[in-house]
């Protein structure tokens, strides 16, 4: 059973309740201890995606079998050794240089870019249910 962690602001209001299992990351499949709206267990896995593509599409096998539904995708993009941003990358402006689209299929993590983003790298965590539960 995951332990509940509650963060409070200075007035004692709850900011973001989450479980310890939500804060654990692994390149191996993990049972999050949570359930999806259909009652199935939610699992997660973190992938070191490596460098983003140069105005193209890059696919990385994730090694998870029996995915029924992906329920969440998030992660970070690294702009060098000491500059990071969340995925999805939120950017104010219309310059597509910052665009990077991530998708998860039953076999791979896909990334598509419209410009050369090979100087950036990504770590992706995706959450999913399984057909075997």
Where are these regions (language model features)?
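Extended, low-complexity, turn-rich repeat/linker tracts enriched in Gly/Pro/Ser/Thr and Asp/Glu
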Residues: 79-82, 117-118
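Generic structural motif
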Residues: 27-29, 72, 100-102
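Surface-exposed interaction regions enriched in Ser/Thr/Asp/Glu
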Residues: 91-133
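Solvent-exposed beta-hairpin/edge-strand motifs
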Residues: 65-77
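Short, surface-exposed beta-strand/strand-loop-strand elements in extracellular ectodomains
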Residues: 85-91
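Intrinsically disordered, low-complexity regions enriched in Ser/Pro/Gly/Gln/His and often acidic
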Residues: 27-29, 77, 95
């Amino acid at each position: 059973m995951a332990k509940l962690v509650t963060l409070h602001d200075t007035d004692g209001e709850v900011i973001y309740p989450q479980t310890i299992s939500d804060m654990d990351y692994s390149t191996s499949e993990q049972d999050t201890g949570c359930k999806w709206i259909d009652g199935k267990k939610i699992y997660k896995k973190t992938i070191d995606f490596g460098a983003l593509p140069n105005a193209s599409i890059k696919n990385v096998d994730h090694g998870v079998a029996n995915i029924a539904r992906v329920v969440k995708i998030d992660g970070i993009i690294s702009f060098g050794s000491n500059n990071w941003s969340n995925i999805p990358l939120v950017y104010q402006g219309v310059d597509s240089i910052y665009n990077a689209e991530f998708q998860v299929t039953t076999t791979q993590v896909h990334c598509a870019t419209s410009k050369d983003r090979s100087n950036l790298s990504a770590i992706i965590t995706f959450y999913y249910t399984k057909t075997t539960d």
